[in-house]
């Protein structure tokens, strides 16, 4: 077989026939994927990654670097250049720049090599579909920069400026229960339940802002299920953070670039550090770093300053959101009928009253499949206040009357329960 490597080149080419083929995006409607996010890794020297809690809380394992994005054709095909001799991962993005699936492995192209794949995590026994696609015959795209040149994704550089601009006006006091989102304080009480040699000697060097905001996101984590993830199972919109913003959290409206930064942070497994020199054990890795640079040159990897990050943004002015007048609606209702297990004894206003307990059997568990249960709870007849004053889309609160009791699921339906139907 003739050698396909061209040592004088610094790039390889990736040809993707159909991003919708394969189980990776099974069920995702055609036309949903608009771009591919292209990233790479700065793999961790000893004691600077993995389960030690060094790069972030519960992940990622290594520092993730954002290279840029490429366009996807309407038929799901794409052809683009990637840096040669570089570990590369891709993430299919929707129209809002949010990953529909997470690639937790990587591939590497030799200089001048053309790599091809049929789809997103297609079966290794699949063969290419014999049809011409739109990307075929086109000049391979160059990767488009993403809000600047290639760099490690750092919370302090990418996410904290967003919080400084939109959030710190209400989230900068320590004497209340709100998340503290200023980037000026560091946590001192970090612990880890993950197996390994995690300790504050290596891990937990994060700001309180990161620790508090981290609670509002959902992503695979560092030791997630090794099986392929369900498409959109960890989509950014599944997180409480994105849902709050979408609901109009006290009328806070982020610009599109800021929303993209939050989405990328979630898609990258919510890291804190974006370079080695910011990690506490950096001084202990001198030999590893020296050998790494030697091997990069020896094996033709692109020369990169892996420690480069732009200067930390300063002087960001807080933008106070407009607070339109809203009608909060009803705020009190006598004779609230629902069961409160914390009330001892349960007293509603002037007399004991619990319409739910009065129903007798008001809880029920149904086995909908072997080992899969659905817990139900009975709502009594009566009146209640529907809505909340927490978010604009939950107002105005309204008194609603229920004419007769009915059963309802006690919790949201899980994917496992849904599949049982």
Language-model segments: residues:
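Short amphipathic, basic-aromatic surface patches that mediate peripheral association
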Residues: 15-27, 168
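Short, surface-exposed beta-strand/beta-hairpin micro-motifs centered on an aromatic residue
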Residues: 75-81, 406-407
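Short, acidic Ser/Thr/Gly-rich low-complexity loop/linker segments typical of extracellular
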Residues: 55-75
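Aromatic- and Gly/Pro-enriched helix-to-coil junctions and flexible linker segments
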Residues: 1-4, 18, 33, 85-87, ...
